[in-house]
């Protein structure tokens, strides 16, 4: 993979073992530096990624380095290997290495794909300063959705800690979780207490075997299993709910950012007809399509039905989640748009009123 720049490894002592693993994976050039020179190296070398070997004690330069990296465009991944202290908000933790860094290489490749996607979008937006400014102001965590699975005593506290940072969808069973994964845009999974190691192992195995979910951030809050799965963004994080949520956020934010970039690219390819946040039509495009559909139905006959899904305008997140679910579940012949009053309008082509009622009820049941 061409990473469009070197990989900088920051450490306070001798060269960390994972740097050699990067060499063996042919992710070069790999440049070693210490904390005193790290900021200058990032500024001068324009790296594709920065990996830090977390020191035993808190490193005062980490926060400043993280702020510098967060302001870098295009997206610059920052990965902290085996951290022992609290991390900045944009530092992705990588723990439980056990001397095997294959999963680190896979995680780095996944992060580099996000960087490449960001670079591609920036090229497409060249000459459109308004769209570029909107992208730069995007907060991926604001629209992120995490699937919290569990039924143990720590579930309520973990739900609150995650909910303070992003949207949360709860599931008390793995069966309910599977349904959410199939109908919602999920940016990460947190697997809490309440399941045996055998059940957890089966769930992780299924995720690893499904290409749709393989790159999802997955956080285990118990240490009963080793991270020996083909899941590059699998983390085992134990501790207080607030610490688990804080350490899970960077991985989830990265996935949400990747999804947002993909939607924006699709919108550009569609000539700006799609809303990059929801995947539905932009309002102007919807109005044009609706007028055309009505005219054709009046001229040639057939069925045409319209459904309005109302959401609380004081909670715009509900409309966003509902719109994304609808964009995933609608038939290809249907189209819709999110309206400014908090509702979502969907047009069912070639559909009579009775069938439209049945479809709308099914869609509503999923969005509850």
Which stretches of residues belong to each language-model region?
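Amphipathic HAMP/coiled-coil signal-transducing linker helices
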Residues: 263-283
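Short regulatory alpha-helical coupling segments
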Residues: 270, 281-302, 321-331
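Conserved phosphotransfer microenvironments
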Residues: 15, 33-39, 48-75, 83-84, ...
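Active-site-flanking beta-strand signature of metal-NTP-handling nucleotidyl enzymes
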Residues: 145-146, 280, 302-313, 336
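Two-component/phosphorelay signaling modules centered on CheY-like receiver
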Residues: 9-30, 151-174
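Receiver (REC) domain switch/output surface
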Residues: 90-91, 97-132, 243-267, 289, ...
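Conserved helix-loop-beta segment at the catalytic/binding core of cyclic-nucleotide signaling proteins
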Residues: 273, 299, 321-356, 365-368
